């Protein structure tokens, strides 16, 4: 389907900033976040889409195809997770219908330890130092290694406390 707004994507046509700075509203799309994870076939890749108005993101979608999980947030509405999504070919699906099928985040229950999530493919010495400092501060720290924007979803969902990124 066509959109009245331009689409900015690293896989798409390169547009000079002189052209892009005039865009009041645009889509930003990463159709394959976690390329290394996709190549490894470990399922830790996502499709990321954002709608930006006047340089402010107003809607974001992260889809995890292998898990059939859809994370989405809309300004003024909240953040949600919908499981079991195969496709949204029906153009008649409304935001309200999606919200009704979803769970509002954060979802996680209380726990007795701190959880950090880090990149599976880009674990830096700075991140390792930061996690060591977390262990000194919190004692019991669990480290979850994951790929793509799944790490951000885990924090949004409440399943992780922090995603340190220094690169």
Predicted features along the sequence, with ranges:
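DPxDG-like acidic metal-binding loop motif
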Residues: 20-84, 88-96
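N-terminal subdomain of lithium-sensitive/metallo-dependent phosphomonoesterases centered on the IMPase/IPPase/PAP
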Residues: 1-32, 87-89, 96-99, 129-132, ...
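Short secondary-structure boundary/capping segments
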Residues: 17-20, 62, 105-108
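An extended, acidic
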Residues: 94-167
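Short intrinsically disordered, low-complexity coil segments enriched in acidic
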Residues: 1-10, 79-80, 142, 160, ...
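Generic detector of well-ordered alpha-helical packing
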Residues: 11, 31-34, 65, 152, ...
């Amino acid at each position: 389907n066509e959109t009245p707004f331009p689409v900015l994507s690293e896989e798409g046509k390169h547009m000079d900033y002189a052209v892009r700075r005039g865009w009041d509203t645009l889509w930003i799309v990463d159709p394959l976040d976690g390329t290394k994870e996709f190549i490894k076939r470990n399922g830790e890749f996502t499709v990321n889409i954002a709608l930006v108005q006047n340089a402010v993101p107003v809607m974001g979608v992260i889809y995890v195809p292998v898990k059939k999980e859809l994370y989405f947030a809309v300004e003024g509405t909240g953040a949600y997770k919908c499981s079991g999504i195969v496709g949204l070919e029906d153009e008649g699906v409304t935001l309200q219908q999606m919200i009704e099928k979803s769970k509002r985040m954060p979802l996680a229950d209380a726990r007795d330890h701190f959880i950090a999530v880090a990149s599976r493919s880009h674990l830096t010495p700075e991140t390792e130092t930061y996690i060591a400092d977390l262990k000194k501060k919190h004692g019991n720290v669990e480290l979850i290694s994951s790929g793509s924007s799944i790490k951000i979803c885990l924090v949004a969902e409440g399943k992780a406390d922090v995603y340190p990124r220094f690169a």
